[in-house]
Amino acid sequence: MPKRTDINTILIIGAGPIVIGQACEFDYSGAQACKALREEGYKVVLVNSNPATIMTDPDMADVTYIEPIEWRTVEKIIEKERPDAILPTMGGQTALNCALDLSKNGVLKKYNVELIGAKEDAIDKAEDRGRFKEAMEKIGLSTPKSFVCHTLEEAWAAQSEVGFPTLIRPSFTMGGSGGGIAYNKDEFYAICERGFDASPTHELLIEQSVLGWKEYEMEVVRDKADNCIIVCSIENFDPMGVHTGDSITVAPAQTLTDKEYQIMRNASIAVLREIGVDTGGSNVQFAINPENGEMIVIEMNPRVSRSSALASKATGFPIAKVAAKLAVGYTLNELRNDITGGLIPASFEPSIDYVVTKVPRFAFEKFPQADDRLTTQMKSVGEVMAMGRTFQESLQKALRGLETGICGFNLMSEEPEKIRQELGNPGPIRILYVADAFGAGFTLDEVHHYSKIDPWFLIQIQDLVLEELALEKRTLDDLDYAELRRLKRKGFSDKRIAQLTKSAESAVRNKRVSLNLHPVYKRVDTCAGEFTSDTAYLYSTYEEECESRPSDKKKIMILGGGPNRIGQGIEFDYCCVHASLALREAGFETIMVNCNPETVSTDFDTSDRLYFEPLTLEDVLEIIHVEKPHGVIVHYGGQTPLKLANDLHANGVNIIGTSADSIDAAEDRERFQQILHKLHLKQPTNRTARNAEEAVKLAEEVGYPLVVRPSYVLGGRAMQIVYNVDELQRYMREAVSVSNDSPILLDHFLNNAIEVDVDCICDGAEVVIGGIMQHIEQAGIHSGDSACSLPPYSLSQEVQDEIRRQTAEMAFALGVKGLMNVQFAVQDGVIYVLEVNPRASRTVPFVSKATGRPLAKIAARVMAGESLKAQGIQGEVIPPFYSVKEAVFPFIKFPGVDTVLGPEMRSTGEVMGVGTTFAEAFLKAQLGANERIPKTGKVFLSVNDADKPRLLPIARQLQESGYGLCATLGTAKFLREHGVAVQIINKVREGRPNIVDAIKNGEIAMVINTVSGLAETVTDGHAIRRSALQQKVFLQTTLAGAEALAGSVEYLADSEVYSLQDLHQRLL
């Protein structure tokens, strides 16, 4: 049946900020859905609070709202836009929960809006653990023995039925939030309490453990005529007990017999029918008992998910696009398969003639206090995918694509005890310990016994380890063409061969080139080569025939950002996509290189050609060897491609835009100082120390407080602010190893300075300022973690003009061609330069949305040789409204981690709020970050002595807005002396009931708590902040943030919703 004509306007709900468990895969699905529905002539209205997404670009939907995804706000949008239908399956758990809220609160009924893609009942049946279990029983499928509970008493009674270890799963959450595995009574109670808090329906499933069973997923698409296809089967390398988002996964499934596969295929289709998903994609998870083959259903997601993004990239079948079209009435046989140029219908099940491996990327180095053991609660922040002709090849490519410094099975430990521990209690790099076990002489049975990983996978790794052990006894000269080719076919990188044969990577590359041994490139075509494909979606392998068929057009290659991690996320992918779009418009053929399956940049139609490859020097040079591009852009993917700039340059690659030398001048401390000196610009006093004694001596010259950091940071405990010599010595002892090669940098810390971020574009002849952002949190907090306002909300015009002048001078002095970001600190009217990055920064998408000017596109054309003047870009756009960017943090996933912000970045994502005043924009940004700000209630205040005078006006303002105040003794005494009525409450160590009790009992509406020194944070403050986080109480740990909050609460009652298109209209 063709599409529906009874609906005209469709509202798509996005996923909001990037958090653990919900990353940029939903930008990919949402962007596809917008394109698909507009193609069909529908009017598309979009709501998403995340400005760093492609889907919120003003030309993706007809009307775009960057507003909080919360049912009251969405109701205002529905009232204004009057959509006929809502598509809630493209925005992860956030969108599903919002759609259910709209239904429960009568909004859908009131405005006569229907849900398409998944009905209320289907969502509820899949997400409500109790109903799902009943539905499975009805169709004769087993689920683990389990009980639905709503109180701790019920949960404990259920536990005695299922025994330890016990699985605890909250309802209506994603990424396993709040859940876990309990091995004893104490852990059980702790996880249950956390789980009840996490579940919006206060409901848990207490489940029998199937730890050690094999885990599989099926990606299913169904249409309303009941046609079903399996897009992809996925097998988890890690057995049950590790969240699938934290598991290494392989597609297609490797260890199922054909009969088992057919049984699972039929079961997954039956699940969709019973749940009632009648249009679109779902994923169904199964577990199989390796002892006897018993199969059970674990859960299903009635929406596109992280796995469906992976399945789309693994097969080339665009699940989200197809699901969007099915939701408006099409059937699978009416849709064509794009990748084959429409030769076959979408009802053909994809078949693949290669192996895909996904490996998760973790960020535990940012959270040293976090527990890095993997359980049913997801902890990874990103992932990398690789393709090869064999599992071994794709696994080795994925490992080197992670960018964690490994290029193969690098040795972690030779201690049998340590290895046993790591095999049985998985952490982020268990696979390397599997290799170590074989290296240390463990048998296959022993490794299987401890790890429960399927023997088929273990044999593959054992074989690679034996290859490595043999290679260590040889030299590079010993290897002939046949042996080198055999190693390359198993996925060994030049770098790993060099390490094992004790030679240089360049020597291995030169030998390979002299033997004319290069990879060939194969196409991803959904049909295993059965039909021809014009789509250049390619991966490398060492075989005979190359399918790349490069053109002789003028082309530019863009290097992407690799796996998401903290500090390098979706913002950089956004810039890469924009570069590709702009250069295509300018008439170039564009080539994208990236290995992140979640992103829009790795969509097969974003660029003319896509190479799904790791971003290492070897892999990039091989693609350049085949494609011979006119130029390469390294400035848009964050640190990943930037690190390759010098080596690419040395290998004769033409880097367009800002040169490798200019990048180095900005990054090299001493060269940069000389430039600032020449321009008469100020920097905070700084010194470089090469040993501990020197550091203590130089610290006196610089003056405390200091920001200390190693000059060469490899993750790790990078930066700290130290207030005295004891803290400095402790940092030197514990955090860093200092030497001549890796000195330590000491900067004077500007206390209570205002930090300012500037993005600009320079074409060599002129500089155009993109935007000036004033940070809300004081300097010393990482710019990626601080909220910021565009335009600035309290900087004087003189200071802003001087910042503009200094920015332009530095851009010219560095010879920038393209984007540049500068961070300044302003203290008592004096401007200091903190750092300069001659590349795309993480604020580019935010500035582009706030000013209506697509900076990344403009700069890409500058890099390709088109001046700003020729593009008609002149002067700065200063909007007549305020935009505030706020950071979103993953603290709730890491019990034990303090929420205090510092110079080390820890946020995973961002949101944006827009308002006619700074206060309105700030409030909307807080709501967008899922903060609950009540209109009434008690505010708890506890600040250090230095902050007390600044607290006074805040306390008065909150009181005038109708809040009650309570404080610890010192703060209360100060406020009372100045005539503010406040109730006194005990500190944690002053007896019960204390502040933590009050927070847990729901008596506190908001907490304002600043830190003093290091010792106190460990005890009182930490307990207060942690309990506020767990009880979802709004928490401010900086006074600047508290000031902004106090000024904005008046907007709680009523704030407007503004569409991006209307805002940009005002700028003309």
UniProtKB/Swiss-Prot annotation:
Pfam families, per database record: CPSase_L_D2, CPSase_L_D3, MGS
Binding-site residues, Mg(2+) 2: 299, 301
Binding site for Mn(2+) 2: 299, 301
GO MF assignments: ATP binding; carbamoyl-phosphate synthase (ammonia) activity; carbamoyl-phosphate synthase (glutamine-hydrolyzing) activity; metal ion binding
PROSITE patterns named in the record: ATP_GRASP, CPSASE_1, CPSASE_2, MGS
Known EC number: 6.3.4.16, 6.3.5.5
Region ranges (Carboxyphosphate synthetic domain): 1-403
Tagged with keyword Metal-binding: yes
Chain sites annotated for binding ATP 1: 129, 169, 175-176, 208, 210, 215, 241-243, 285, 299
Residue segments, region Oligomerization domain: 404-548
UniProt keyword Ligase present: yes
Region (Allosteric domain): 931-1068
Domain MGS-like: start-end pairs: 931-1068
Catalytic activity: hydrogencarbonate + L-glutamine + 2 ATP + H2O = carbamoyl phosphate + L-glutamate + 2 ADP + phosphate + 2 H(+)
Cross-referenced NCBIfam families: CPSaseII_lrg, PRK05294.1, PRK12815.1
Domain notes: The large subunit is composed of 2 ATP-grasp domains that are involved in binding the 2 ATP molecules needed for carbamoyl phosphate synthesis. The N-terminal ATP-grasp domain (referred to as the carboxyphosphate synthetic component) catalyzes the ATP-dependent phosphorylation of hydrogencarbonate to carboxyphosphate and the subsequent nucleophilic attack by ammonia to form a carbamate intermediate.
Protein's name in the database: Carbamoyl phosphate synthase large chain
Provenance organism: Pasteurella multocida (strain Pm70)
